[in-house]
Amino acid sequence: MSALGTLNSVVRDEIFALNLAFNSDDHPQKVNLSVGAYRSDSGKPWPLPAVQEAEKQLFAEANAFRHEYTTIAGDAGFLEAARDLMFGFDNLQNAAGTAAKLRISSVQTVAGTGANHLGALFLSKYLKPQTVWLSDPTWANHYTIWDLVKVPYKMYPYYSASDGSFDFHGMMSTLESDAQPGDIILLQACAHNPTGLDPSPQQWKDIANLCDRKHLFPFIDAAYQGFATGCTNNDNWIVRYFLNKKPHIDMCVAQSFSKNLGLYGQRVGAFHYVLNEDGKGLRDTVTDHLCQLIRGEYTMGPVAGSDIVKRVLTNPVLRAQWFENMRSMSFRIVAMRKALFDELTRLKTPGSWKHITEMIGMFSYIGLSPTQVEVLKTKYHIYLLQSSRASMSGLNSTNVIYVARAIDETQAFPDLSWRPLPPRSGHPIYHGLEPGQVILPKGTVRFASWRSLPVDTEFNRDVPVVLRDGVTIYLDVFRPTETARSSPPYTSEANMERRGQAAYSSTPLRRIGLTFLNRTLKI
């Protein structure tokens, strides 16, 4: 027997599994809305013209040192250009900008995932936080990254499934009441993945003030600078606000060039740790500790991709061309949102679809049930995540009407039935969940629970429960199988009622004791 004979199976990454299934599908009308990569109106990858020109220039120079080692921290020219782009120093050539630069430790990473991981590893080792707060929902890889560094996470409300809006009140009230000094709060700078919903400038100010008042550590994931509005300076607004208006607190930023330069496979990113004004003398020490972690993992970031980024950012002609390329991508996605909304409206598809045009960036939560998503895949060959997150760049002028009609026709499919879930090892549903209590924020979607179930779990969808005040809510009930009876049952508020209409109480539902649910549902 192998030494790994007792190794538990794990659930494969949903996005990559869907992409593999899409590539194996030979249906002529198949549509891929799962992968977070930009596609042109012809449905093909679009190498940015600015990137192609940069590659031509680099190749023509035939630099014999192009493939040599740089430094553990990374290429100095790339890091300076990346830092200036992220923190807006291009427009701040004065004494204040010079002073702010001295507070920032920057290192090159293996794209945005590597920046998130390095930051999580560094903070877990030296700040030793008790909790990291993640938005509900968030990018799925955030859970894995923080699990690997053994920092428990809790969720703050972010998305209201009842109307497809940003749940600012739920976020603020939860963090105000439950977050503790020293906790990390993970924020996405723009084009929130997966919801496509961003705070307004005033809401960002309120969030920053809460971090200041509660002594929370902001960790900003900036994977889509330029994708939200087509303007890099607009999309890094919260980063610049923290830097300039909250100089007395530390923060960090994970930066990626995968999306905004289309360098998905080149893995180009940076991690920036921003010291407060009193700690700026520690910058080199912070860099040394980051380099120690880098040396033990990947030694240095890839050179080929960072050379391209450096050339684009430092060449005025290419930089201007790149800005135009980003605007083209951003505006096409906006046009596809409107086209999908217009067709659903024309078809008189039940429900409100205005959230599709109100969301920004690459992704949208369409608002379909898992059963409807499955129907889209099996009957119409349209691939999107079970949460109904869709990459809007997968839409184009030749398939948007087909997708809209398919969505319209899936409204006839209810979301019922028993079915087993695949075994999954690892963490419980919510780290820090107290026994006998389940948190049910208004608007919680079903996907928030199935993604992190214990091993050997079954679930029943859309179980109606009449509360003491007479309000009926629809719950997904999760309970262990006979082989795992030691695990307690969990519930999650369903996002769709049986006929496809939202079923929520008129007042925000915050907590329900499991003892009440046990008695009602006879679990």
From Swiss-Prot:
This is L-tyrosine:2-oxoglutarate aminotransferase ucdG. It is found in: Cytoplasm. Nonribosomal peptide synthetase that mediates the biosynthesis of usterphenyllins and uscandidusins, p-terphenyl derivatives. Within the pathway, ucdG is probably involved in the conversion of L-tyrosine into 4-hydroxyphenylpyruvate (HPPA) as a precursor for the usterphenyllin and uscandidusin biosynthesis. The pathway begin with the biosynthesis of 4-hydroxyphenylpyruvate (HPPA) from L-tyrosine, possibly by the aminotransferase ucdG. Keywords: Aminotransferase, Cytoplasm, Pyridoxal phosphate, Transferase. The keyword tRNA processing does not apply. PANTHER family: ASPARTATE AMINOTRANSFERASE. It comes from the Eukaryota. Its EC number is 2.6.1.5. The keyword Manganese does not apply. Homodimer. It comes from Aspergillus ustus. One of its GO terms (molecular function) is pyridoxal phosphate binding. GO terms for biological process: aspartate biosynthetic process. Disruption phenotype: Lieds to a slightly decreased formation of usterphenyllins and uscandidusins in Aspergillus nidulans.
